[in-house]
Amino acid sequence: MAEGYREYRDKVLGFIEDHENWRKHTINLIASENVTSPSVTRAVASGFMHKYAEGWPKQRYYQGCKYVDEVELIGVELFTKLFGSDFADLRPISGTNANQAVFFGLTQPGDKAIVLHTSHGGHISHMPFGAAGMRGLEVHTWPFDNEEFNIDVDKAEKLIREVEPKIVVFGGSLFPFPHPVKELAPVAKEVGAYVMYDGAHVLGLIAGKQFQDPLREGADIITASTHKTFPGPQGGVIIYKRFGETEEIAKLQWAIFPGVLSNHHLHHMAGKVITAAEMLEYGEKYAAQIVKNAKALAEALAEEGFKVIGEDKGYTESHQVIVDVSDLHPAAGGWAAPLLEEAGIILNKNLLPWDPLEKVNEPSGLRIGVQEMTRVGMMEDEMKEIARFIRRVLIDKEDPAKVRRDVYGFRAEYQKVYYSFDHGLPLRLRE
């Protein structure tokens, strides 16, 4: 009887193969995704996936962890070196899990937090309906300057003094420009607040020294996922310097384990470690090319007739390009993103700061990220070609199937994962 279920295995493996073939021939511009190197993929598919470990290396609650411990200790060494921190905890299994640990470790129900609203690019885990709310925090949101596409510093300073929060959170999901950590962290600390920086989207840019340096600008803690501009497997990390009293750090560590996780997905942990080594070796060049590509794509899209956000600020300082398509169709991003998918161009619709929340399914914006296409070797010239593909679909109204054929041929030339020990740098950066 069990033999009859083999077809489900075959179907699943078939769908996986179909997905991999499809993805290799699309232009993936999802800002929260990336591609791992063969070495990292090997680590994630290793026998570490079968192992269980709880607690700190050399202090496990399970036996048989001697090799796992060595890998995790290497990881702590590499992450602290990469980010210039005192501590790095690789155990969180996602960025949201890392945020949970900080909220549960350093705050109490009823404490106040100031975060970025989701309409302004804040992450759902920061909100009353996310991890912050589940902790029972009273959530306030940063005043936002739509023209600057950033936190309003003067109004934020006033809000901090009025609210006297226990924690303030910088960072988010719509993140083209650095946040004013340097300006606002001292004010937060005046009222006794912890300063947390959610670097999920920009962790690789921080590692590559191409974005702001939160720990040097006043943040106590960086939380992040490890699979966006930091091109590792899906997972999380908490990076921090010494802050407060020893007992406060102990509370944070206790919140991670046994608070919000037990075993920490050791195969993914191993992949994070190899990715950290790759970023120490290649991260500065990778991050620099990401920012160059984002700027090039933004400029090219503007030249093709799109309304790209942030023109007076150089469009972007990160991997993200934000486009307002509300003038192209009543459904705006809700129309554009599926149409582009038909053409093999993958990105996501996104609320813009002036959108009401009820427009979540038909928001004004598109969020574009260039980190994955950068990692497969694309540079500024390729960004211009991508902009032309997008114009053909959304402005020229060409048949997406026709554009898809051209996208397939274009993407076929970019199949290696660079900025890695497997393939080194792209050839054009070796010259």
Curated annotation (Swiss-Prot):
One of its GO terms (molecular function) is pyridoxal phosphate binding. Keywords: Amino-acid biosynthesis, Cytoplasm, One-carbon metabolism, Pyridoxal phosphate, Transferase. The record marks 227 as: Plays an important role in substrate specificity. GO terms for biological process: glycine biosynthetic process from serine; tetrahydrofolate interconversion; tetrahydrofolate metabolic process. The modification N6-(pyridoxal phosphate)lysine is found at residue 228. Belongs to the SHMT family. This is Serine hydroxymethyltransferase. It comes from Thermococcus kodakarensis (strain ATCC BAA-918 / JCM 12380 / KOD1). The gene is glyA.
